[in-house]
Amino acid sequence: MTAIKELKAVARPRAGKGAARAERRAGRVPAVIYGEKQEPVTISLNFREINKTIYAGHFLTTLFEIDVDGTKHRVIPRDYQLDVVKDFPLHVDFLRVSQGATVTVEVPVHFLNQEASPALKAGGTLNVVAHAVELECPAESIPASVEVDLTGAAYGDTFHLSGIKLPAGVTWAGHGDDTLATVVAPSGQADAAAEDAAEAAKA
């Protein structure tokens, strides 16, 4: 689970493209806080701080407390824009999150213990179908990732959502029993198996 992190911001009295450009020239990143049936609050963040925070990882699944000139806002990032050439942040959107609220987030899928799979050690391939999945969870308990244990995985094994144990209070968001990955034999072995099956069918 990711811990609540703190950010400092200042109120941005003017909105619009011109005001946003002025903030960037001053070394700040424009942002907005919205949601919870309250008026949006336009803010700006220190460029170095928010750039480092974004590239530290798990940004969109981290709960933040933003101090805006002494007023604290509990939020989760919903989107951010990067410069298409230099990849530095241009704008960030934050969603207000009340105490005990449930949020929908996308988290990465991590495949563990590939070295403990006989099939993968013998040259098989892990065919990853889903690199990320959506979860519904308490804002205070967002998993950093979903983990799939490949220990003992053999050729033809398929890993589904239903086989993954989630933390208490966390559920899949709008999924059926989707496939996450399959273990595929090397092409030569797969071709040989297909030929054997065809010969057996003729017999």
UniProtKB/Swiss-Prot annotation:
Keywords per UniProt? Ribonucleoprotein, Ribosomal protein, RNA-binding, rRNA-binding
Q: Which InterPro entries match?
A: Rbsml_bL25/Gln-tRNA_synth_N, Ribosomal_bL25/Gln-tRNA_synth, Ribosomal_bL25_b-dom, Ribosomal_bL25_C, Ribosomal_bL25_long, Ribosomal_L25_dom, Ribosomal_uL5_bac-type
Q: In its keyword annotation, does this UniProt entry include Acetylation?
A: no
Q: Which GO terms describe its biological process?
A: translation
What's in the GO CC field? cytosolic large ribosomal subunit
- What are the recorded GO MF terms, alphabetically? 5S rRNA binding; structural constituent of ribosome
- Give the top-rank taxon of the lineage listed in the UniProt record for this protein: Bacteria
Signal peptide as annotated in the record: none
Give the record's family classification. Answer: Belongs to the bacterial ribosomal protein bL25 family. CTC subfamily.
What is its biological role? This is one of the proteins that binds to the 5S RNA in the ribosome where it forms part of the central protuberance.
NCBIfam families noted in UniProt: bL25_bact_ctc, PRK05618.1-2
Q: How does it assemble?
A: Part of the 50S ribosomal subunit; part of the 5S rRNA/L5/L18/L25 subcomplex. Contacts the 5S rRNA. Binds to the 5S rRNA independently of L5 and L18.
Name of the protein described by the UniProt record: Large ribosomal subunit protein bL25
